[in-house]
């Protein structure tokens, strides 16, 4: 059911290959700090796709998720909204209403990026302390991260604006 929801919401980015192509297109049109952040998001997206497509267990990718570019840009007070100068806010689209991403409607790019990296850091912290905790559904956590990354990609490509 969760994968069906993903397919419905993100049919334009419904595979690792199409997401990689979308990142490639965005990377070609961005330079400097924006490109650095997009490269990091691309890597994190690739890792989450491995879990979504059931190729690897979350335990193998969680330690590999990276936040270095984000952390550096955050320390420099980078304006993450510059990734999308024309489309600042997530539009109210029917495909988002009633979904677990509905809370992002009306949020700006910086808020979506912050939520992505907050999820990564939280997941890595909890995983580092108690990786074998059976009460934590690591697949669901990675899937939720994956959906946020795809939401950002769709917005940056203009699909949700």
Predicted regions and their residues:
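Compositionally biased, intrinsically disordered low-complexity regions enriched
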Residues: 1, 55, 59-62, 128, ...
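Short, cationic, amphipathic peptide segments
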Residues: 1-27
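Amphipathic, non-membrane alpha-helical segments in soluble helical-bundle scaffolds
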Residues: 3-6, 27-41, 99-113, 139
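A near-ubiquitous, low-amplitude feature marking generic local secondary-structure context
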Residues: 13, 20, 24, 31, ...
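Amphipathic, membrane-active segments
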Residues: 19-73, 146
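Detector for Asparagine
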Residues: 30-33, 44, 77-81, 133, ...
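Amphipathic alpha-helical blocks and their helix-capping loop/short-beta junctions
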Residues: 62-90
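An amphipathic alpha-helical interaction surface
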Residues: 85-161
């Amino acid at each position: 059911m969760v994968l069906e929801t993903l397919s419905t919401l993100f049919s334009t980015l419904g595979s690792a290959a199409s997401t990689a192509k979308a990142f490639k297109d965005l990377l070609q049109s961005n330079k400097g700090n924006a490109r650095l952040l997009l490269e990091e998001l691309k890597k994190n997206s690739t890792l989450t796709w491995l879990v979504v497509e059931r190729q690897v267990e979350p335990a193998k990718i969680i330690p590999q998720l990276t936040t270095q570019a984000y952390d550096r840009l955050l320390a420099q007070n980078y304006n993450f909204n510059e990734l999308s100068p024309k489309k600042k806010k997530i539009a109210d689209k029917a495909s988002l209403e009633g979904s677990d991403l509905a809370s992002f409607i009306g949020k700006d790019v910086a808020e979506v990026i912050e939520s992505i990296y907050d999820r990564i850091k939280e997941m890595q912290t909890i995983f580092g302390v108690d990786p074998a905790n059976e009460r934590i559904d690591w697949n669901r956590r990675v899937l939720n991260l994956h959906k946020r990354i795809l939401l950002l990609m769709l917005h940056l490509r203009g699909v949700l604006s």
